[in-house]
Amino acid sequence: MDYTHQTALIPCGQDKYMPKSELLLHLKTYNLYYEGQNLQLRHREEEDEFIVEGLLNISWGLRRPIRLQMQDDHERIRPPPSSSSWHSGCNLGAQGTTLKPLTVPTVQISEVDMPVENMEMHSPTDSRGLKPVQEDTPQLMRTRSDVGVRRRGNVRTSSDQRRIRRHRFSINGHFYNHKTSVFTPAYGSVTNVRINSTMTTPQVLKLLLNKFKIENSAEEFALYVVHTSGEKQKLKNSDYPLIARILQGPCEQISKVFLMEKDQVEEVTYDVAQYIKFEMPVLKSFIQKLQEEEDREVEKLMQKYTVLRLMIRQRLEEIAETPETI
Protein backbone atom coordinates (compact mmCIF):
# COMPACT_ATOMS: atom_id res chain seq x y z
CA MET A 1 0.00 0.00 0.00
CA ASP A 2 1.16 3.50 -0.79
CA TYR A 3 0.85 5.71 2.29
CA THR A 4 1.78 9.01 0.65
CA HIS A 5 1.37 12.39 2.25
CA GLN A 6 -2.04 13.87 1.52
CA THR A 7 -3.68 17.12 2.61
CA ALA A 8 -7.30 16.35 1.67
CA LEU A 9 -9.95 16.21 4.41
CA ILE A 10 -11.79 12.96 5.13
CA PRO A 11 -15.27 13.02 6.75
CA CYS A 12 -15.39 11.09 10.03
CA GLY A 13 -18.83 12.18 11.25
CA GLN A 14 -21.35 14.97 11.07
CA ASP A 15 -19.44 18.23 10.56
CA LYS A 16 -16.24 16.42 11.53
CA TYR A 17 -13.24 16.09 9.24
CA MET A 18 -9.63 15.01 9.55
CA PRO A 19 -6.60 15.31 7.26
CA LYS A 20 -6.12 12.41 4.90
CA SER A 21 -2.47 12.17 5.90
CA GLU A 22 -3.43 11.63 9.54
CA LEU A 23 -5.93 8.90 8.63
CA LEU A 24 -3.30 7.17 6.52
CA LEU A 25 -0.92 7.10 9.48
CA HIS A 26 -3.62 5.49 11.64
CA LEU A 27 -4.36 3.03 8.84
CA LYS A 28 -0.70 2.10 8.52
CA THR A 29 -0.49 1.39 12.25
CA TYR A 30 -3.70 -0.62 12.07
CA ASN A 31 -2.43 -2.84 9.24
CA LEU A 32 0.95 -3.36 10.88
CA TYR A 33 -0.84 -4.65 13.98
CA TYR A 34 -2.84 -7.16 11.88
CA GLU A 35 -0.03 -8.03 9.49
CA GLY A 36 -0.68 -11.37 7.82
CA GLN A 37 -4.29 -11.53 9.04
CA ASN A 38 -7.59 -11.06 7.25
CA LEU A 39 -8.40 -8.05 9.45
CA GLN A 40 -6.06 -5.85 7.46
CA LEU A 41 -7.82 -2.96 5.69
CA ARG A 42 -7.45 -1.76 2.11
CA HIS A 43 -7.97 1.70 0.69
CA ARG A 44 -8.69 3.01 -2.79
CA GLU A 45 -9.68 6.15 -4.65
CA GLU A 46 -13.05 6.15 -6.38
CA GLU A 47 -14.26 9.32 -8.11
CA ASP A 48 -11.98 11.46 -5.94
CA GLU A 49 -13.36 9.78 -2.81
CA PHE A 50 -11.04 8.03 -0.38
CA ILE A 51 -12.54 4.67 0.66
CA VAL A 52 -11.26 2.19 3.24
CA GLU A 53 -12.76 -1.31 3.29
CA GLY A 54 -12.33 -4.52 5.23
CA LEU A 55 -13.65 -6.60 8.12
CA LEU A 56 -14.91 -4.99 11.32
CA ASN A 57 -15.10 -7.08 14.49
CA ILE A 58 -18.31 -6.53 16.48
CA SER A 59 -18.93 -8.07 19.91
CA TRP A 60 -22.39 -9.15 21.04
CA GLY A 61 -23.52 -7.20 24.10
CA LEU A 62 -27.26 -7.94 24.13
CA ARG A 63 -29.24 -8.47 27.32
CA ARG A 64 -32.56 -9.39 25.71
CA PRO A 65 -33.32 -12.24 23.28
CA ILE A 66 -33.37 -11.67 19.54
CA ARG A 67 -35.63 -13.33 16.97
CA LEU A 68 -34.36 -15.28 13.98
CA GLN A 69 -36.24 -15.72 10.73
CA MET A 70 -37.81 -19.16 10.43
CA GLN A 71 -36.82 -19.47 6.77
CA ASP A 72 -34.77 -17.55 4.25
CA ASP A 73 -36.95 -16.76 1.26
CA HIS A 74 -33.99 -15.90 -0.96
CA GLU A 75 -31.91 -19.01 -0.45
CA ARG A 76 -32.85 -22.59 -1.24
CA ILE A 77 -31.17 -25.12 1.00
CA ARG A 78 -30.48 -28.37 -0.83
CA PRO A 79 -30.41 -31.37 1.51
CA PRO A 80 -27.57 -33.87 1.15
CA PRO A 81 -28.29 -37.30 -0.36
CA SER A 82 -29.89 -39.59 2.19
CA SER A 83 -28.21 -42.77 3.27
CA SER A 84 -30.98 -44.84 1.66
CA SER A 85 -30.11 -43.63 -1.85
CA TRP A 86 -27.29 -44.93 -4.02
CA HIS A 87 -23.92 -43.23 -4.33
CA SER A 88 -23.71 -39.91 -6.13
CA GLY A 89 -23.91 -40.13 -9.89
CA CYS A 90 -26.73 -42.66 -10.09
CA ASN A 91 -29.49 -40.16 -9.24
CA LEU A 92 -29.01 -38.05 -12.35
CA GLY A 93 -30.64 -38.87 -15.66
CA ALA A 94 -29.34 -38.11 -19.10
CA GLN A 95 -30.62 -34.51 -18.96
CA GLY A 96 -29.28 -33.85 -15.48
CA THR A 97 -32.70 -34.17 -13.84
CA THR A 98 -32.98 -35.70 -10.40
CA LEU A 99 -34.60 -39.10 -10.38
CA LYS A 100 -36.37 -40.73 -7.49
CA PRO A 101 -33.90 -42.42 -5.12
CA LEU A 102 -33.72 -46.15 -5.64
CA THR A 103 -34.65 -48.24 -2.64
CA VAL A 104 -32.60 -51.26 -1.69
CA PRO A 105 -34.43 -54.46 -2.61
CA THR A 106 -35.18 -56.65 0.37
CA VAL A 107 -33.62 -59.86 -0.87
CA GLN A 108 -31.68 -62.59 0.81
CA ILE A 109 -27.99 -62.25 -0.05
CA SER A 110 -26.03 -65.47 0.09
CA GLU A 111 -22.64 -66.41 -1.21
CA VAL A 112 -22.54 -69.50 -3.49
CA ASP A 113 -19.31 -71.13 -4.41
CA MET A 114 -19.68 -71.89 -8.11
CA PRO A 115 -16.94 -73.51 -10.15
CA VAL A 116 -15.25 -71.42 -12.72
CA GLU A 117 -16.53 -73.66 -15.51
CA ASN A 118 -20.17 -73.26 -14.46
CA MET A 119 -19.79 -69.52 -14.24
CA GLU A 120 -18.46 -69.42 -17.78
CA MET A 121 -21.25 -71.66 -19.08
CA HIS A 122 -24.00 -69.57 -17.53
CA SER A 123 -22.58 -66.23 -18.56
CA PRO A 124 -25.23 -64.14 -20.28
CA THR A 125 -24.86 -63.68 -24.03
CA ASP A 126 -26.35 -61.29 -26.49
CA SER A 127 -29.07 -62.28 -28.98
CA ARG A 128 -26.52 -63.30 -31.61
CA GLY A 129 -24.62 -65.61 -29.26
CA LEU A 130 -21.31 -63.85 -29.82
CA LYS A 131 -19.67 -63.18 -26.49
CA PRO A 132 -20.69 -62.64 -22.92
CA VAL A 133 -22.36 -59.30 -22.31
CA GLN A 134 -21.10 -57.36 -19.32
CA GLU A 135 -23.59 -55.09 -17.58
CA ASP A 136 -22.60 -51.45 -17.94
CA THR A 137 -24.45 -50.28 -14.86
CA PRO A 138 -21.89 -49.79 -12.10
CA GLN A 139 -24.27 -47.47 -10.26
CA LEU A 140 -26.58 -50.42 -9.49
CA MET A 141 -23.91 -52.62 -7.96
CA ARG A 142 -24.32 -53.13 -4.28
CA THR A 143 -21.24 -52.92 -2.16
CA ARG A 144 -20.66 -54.00 1.38
CA SER A 145 -20.59 -50.35 2.45
CA ASP A 146 -24.09 -49.90 1.01
CA VAL A 147 -25.38 -52.90 2.92
CA GLY A 148 -23.78 -51.65 6.11
CA VAL A 149 -25.37 -48.23 5.79
CA ARG A 150 -28.76 -49.79 5.11
CA ARG A 151 -28.67 -51.84 8.28
CA ARG A 152 -28.22 -48.78 10.54
CA GLY A 153 -31.54 -48.11 12.17
CA ASN A 154 -30.84 -44.57 13.49
CA VAL A 155 -30.29 -42.90 10.11
CA ARG A 156 -32.64 -39.98 9.39
CA THR A 157 -34.75 -40.06 6.28
CA SER A 158 -34.36 -37.45 3.54
CA SER A 159 -37.52 -35.65 4.69
CA ASP A 160 -36.21 -35.41 8.26
CA GLN A 161 -32.88 -34.02 7.09
CA ARG A 162 -34.64 -31.52 4.85
CA ARG A 163 -36.84 -30.36 7.72
CA ILE A 164 -33.88 -29.95 10.08
CA ARG A 165 -31.81 -28.05 7.54
CA ARG A 166 -34.74 -25.76 6.77
CA HIS A 167 -34.95 -24.63 10.39
CA ARG A 168 -31.23 -24.33 11.11
CA PHE A 169 -29.32 -21.08 11.43
CA SER A 170 -25.81 -20.33 12.61
CA ILE A 171 -24.35 -17.47 14.64
CA ASN A 172 -20.64 -17.67 15.40
CA GLY A 173 -20.63 -21.32 14.36
CA HIS A 174 -23.45 -22.36 16.70
CA PHE A 175 -26.57 -23.87 15.15
CA TYR A 176 -30.08 -23.15 16.33
CA ASN A 177 -33.24 -24.80 15.08
CA HIS A 178 -36.80 -23.49 15.09
CA LYS A 179 -37.27 -24.39 18.75
CA THR A 180 -34.49 -21.99 19.74
CA SER A 181 -35.12 -19.27 17.16
CA VAL A 182 -35.46 -16.79 20.06
CA PHE A 183 -32.23 -16.61 22.05
CA THR A 184 -29.56 -14.29 23.46
CA PRO A 185 -26.04 -14.51 21.95
CA ALA A 186 -23.23 -15.10 24.41
CA TYR A 187 -22.07 -11.78 25.84
CA GLY A 188 -18.70 -10.79 24.43
CA SER A 189 -18.69 -13.31 21.58
CA VAL A 190 -17.30 -11.78 18.40
CA THR A 191 -18.57 -11.69 14.84
CA ASN A 192 -17.52 -9.55 11.89
CA VAL A 193 -18.94 -7.84 8.83
CA ARG A 194 -17.25 -6.56 5.69
CA ILE A 195 -17.90 -2.83 5.36
CA ASN A 196 -16.28 0.33 4.02
CA SER A 197 -15.59 3.78 5.40
CA THR A 198 -18.60 5.35 3.65
CA MET A 199 -21.14 3.23 5.54
CA THR A 200 -22.86 4.94 8.46
CA THR A 201 -23.91 3.33 11.74
CA PRO A 202 -27.49 2.45 10.63
CA GLN A 203 -26.15 0.83 7.45
CA VAL A 204 -23.71 -1.33 9.41
CA LEU A 205 -26.46 -2.36 11.82
CA LYS A 206 -28.76 -3.46 8.99
CA LEU A 207 -25.93 -5.36 7.33
CA LEU A 208 -25.17 -7.25 10.56
CA LEU A 209 -28.82 -8.14 11.18
CA ASN A 210 -29.30 -9.31 7.60
CA LYS A 211 -26.19 -11.46 7.82
CA PHE A 212 -27.75 -13.59 10.56
CA LYS A 213 -31.39 -13.24 9.40
CA ILE A 214 -32.44 -11.41 12.57
CA GLU A 215 -36.03 -10.16 12.48
CA ASN A 216 -35.56 -7.40 15.05
CA SER A 217 -35.51 -3.86 13.71
CA ALA A 218 -32.18 -2.06 13.50
CA GLU A 219 -33.81 0.80 15.43
CA GLU A 220 -33.65 -1.34 18.59
CA PHE A 221 -29.86 -1.47 18.62
CA ALA A 222 -26.83 0.80 18.66
CA LEU A 223 -23.08 0.45 18.31
CA TYR A 224 -20.87 1.41 21.26
CA VAL A 225 -17.12 1.77 21.59
CA VAL A 226 -16.41 0.19 24.97
CA HIS A 227 -13.04 0.70 26.67
CA THR A 228 -11.50 -1.51 29.32
CA SER A 229 -11.72 1.45 31.70
CA GLY A 230 -15.53 1.26 31.49
CA GLU A 231 -15.98 4.22 29.18
CA LYS A 232 -18.85 3.72 26.70
CA GLN A 233 -19.17 5.95 23.67
CA LYS A 234 -22.27 5.57 21.52
CA LEU A 235 -21.71 5.92 17.78
CA LYS A 236 -24.11 8.44 16.27
CA ASN A 237 -26.15 7.75 13.15
CA SER A 238 -23.86 10.09 11.22
CA ASP A 239 -20.67 8.33 12.36
CA TYR A 240 -18.68 5.87 10.26
CA PRO A 241 -17.91 2.77 12.39
CA LEU A 242 -14.88 1.70 10.36
CA ILE A 243 -13.30 5.16 10.68
CA ALA A 244 -14.09 5.13 14.40
CA ARG A 245 -12.38 1.74 14.78
CA ILE A 246 -9.26 2.98 12.96
CA LEU A 247 -9.03 6.09 15.15
CA GLN A 248 -9.48 4.04 18.33
CA GLY A 249 -6.56 1.83 17.33
CA PRO A 250 -6.40 -1.85 16.40
CA CYS A 251 -5.93 -3.39 19.86
CA GLU A 252 -9.21 -4.89 21.08
CA GLN A 253 -7.79 -5.36 24.56
CA ILE A 254 -8.13 -1.60 24.95
CA SER A 255 -11.42 -0.95 23.15
CA LYS A 256 -14.06 -2.99 21.34
CA VAL A 257 -17.11 -2.25 19.20
CA PHE A 258 -20.24 -3.70 20.84
CA LEU A 259 -23.76 -4.25 19.55
CA MET A 260 -26.14 -3.31 22.39
CA GLU A 261 -29.75 -2.37 23.01
CA LYS A 262 -30.30 1.32 22.47
CA ASP A 263 -32.56 1.76 25.52
CA GLN A 264 -30.59 -0.46 27.92
CA VAL A 265 -27.18 1.22 27.85
CA GLU A 266 -26.12 4.70 28.93
CA GLU A 267 -22.99 6.43 27.79
CA VAL A 268 -20.17 6.65 30.33
CA THR A 269 -17.75 9.54 29.98
CA TYR A 270 -14.03 9.24 30.59
CA ASP A 271 -14.21 11.20 33.86
CA VAL A 272 -16.85 8.86 35.26
CA ALA A 273 -15.16 5.73 33.92
CA GLN A 274 -12.12 6.38 36.13
CA TYR A 275 -14.14 5.52 39.24
CA ILE A 276 -16.32 2.65 37.98
CA LYS A 277 -14.11 -0.22 39.09
CA PHE A 278 -13.54 1.03 42.66
CA GLU A 279 -15.31 -0.56 45.62
CA MET A 280 -17.96 1.38 47.54
CA PRO A 281 -15.76 2.15 50.60
CA VAL A 282 -13.10 3.59 48.33
CA LEU A 283 -15.69 5.70 46.49
CA LYS A 284 -17.02 7.01 49.81
CA SER A 285 -13.51 8.02 50.84
CA PHE A 286 -13.17 9.87 47.53
CA ILE A 287 -16.41 11.72 48.22
CA GLN A 288 -15.21 12.67 51.70
CA LYS A 289 -11.92 14.00 50.35
CA LEU A 290 -13.74 15.99 47.68
CA GLN A 291 -16.07 17.44 50.29
CA GLU A 292 -13.15 18.51 52.46
CA GLU A 293 -11.45 20.10 49.46
CA GLU A 294 -14.66 21.92 48.57
CA ASP A 295 -14.99 23.25 52.13
CA ARG A 296 -11.43 24.58 52.02
CA GLU A 297 -12.04 26.34 48.72
CA VAL A 298 -15.25 27.88 50.06
CA GLU A 299 -13.40 29.11 53.15
CA LYS A 300 -10.66 30.69 51.03
CA LEU A 301 -13.24 32.41 48.85
CA MET A 302 -15.12 33.79 51.87
CA GLN A 303 -11.91 35.14 53.42
CA LYS A 304 -10.96 36.81 50.15
CA TYR A 305 -14.23 38.71 49.86
CA THR A 306 -14.23 39.53 53.56
CA VAL A 307 -10.87 41.29 53.13
CA LEU A 308 -12.14 43.12 50.04
CA ARG A 309 -15.23 44.27 51.90
CA LEU A 310 -13.13 45.66 54.76
CA MET A 311 -10.86 47.50 52.34
CA ILE A 312 -13.84 49.12 50.62
CA ARG A 313 -15.40 50.22 53.92
CA GLN A 314 -12.11 51.66 55.14
CA ARG A 315 -11.73 53.67 51.97
CA LEU A 316 -15.29 55.00 52.24
CA GLU A 317 -14.63 56.14 55.80
CA GLU A 318 -11.47 57.96 54.71
CA ILE A 319 -13.38 59.80 52.02
CA ALA A 320 -16.11 60.79 54.46
CA GLU A 321 -13.59 62.26 56.97
CA THR A 322 -11.72 64.34 54.40
CA PRO A 323 -13.05 68.02 54.32
CA GLU A 324 -14.48 69.17 51.04
CA THR A 325 -12.23 71.46 49.06
CA ILE A 326 -13.40 74.17 46.71
UniProtKB/Swiss-Prot annotation:
UniProt subcellular location: Nucleus; Cytoplasm; Chromosome, Centromere, Kinetochore
Gene Ontology CC annotation, any one: kinetochore
InterPro entries according to UniProt: RA_dom, RASSF1-6, RASSF2_RA, SARAH_dom, Ubiquitin-like_domsf
Keyword Transmembrane helix part of the UniProt annotation: no
Taxonomic superkingdom: Eukaryota
MF annotations from Gene Ontology: protein kinase activity
PTMs per UniProt: Phosphorylated by STK3/MST2 and STK4/MST1.
Biological-process GO terms, alphabetical: bone remodeling; canonical NF-kappaB signal transduction; homeostasis of number of cells; negative regulation of non-canonical NF-kappaB signal transduction; ossification; positive regulation of apoptotic process; positive regulation of JNK cascade; protein stabilization
Ras-associating domain ranges (all copies): 176-264
Domain SARAH: 272-319
Key words of the record: Cell cycle, Centromere, Chromosome, Cytoplasm, Kinetochore, Nucleus, Phosphoprotein, Tumor suppressor
PANTHER family for the chain: RAS ASSOCIATION DOMAIN-CONTAINING PROTEIN 2, RASSF
Complexes and interactors: Interacts directly with activated KRAS in a GTP-dependent manner. Interacts (via SARAH domain) with STK3/MST2 and STK4/MST1.
Role noted for this protein: Potential tumor suppressor. Acts as a KRAS-specific effector protein. May promote apoptosis and cell cycle arrest. Stabilizes STK3/MST2 by protecting it from proteasomal degradation.
Protein name: Ras association domain-containing protein 2
Species of origin: Rattus norvegicus (Rat)
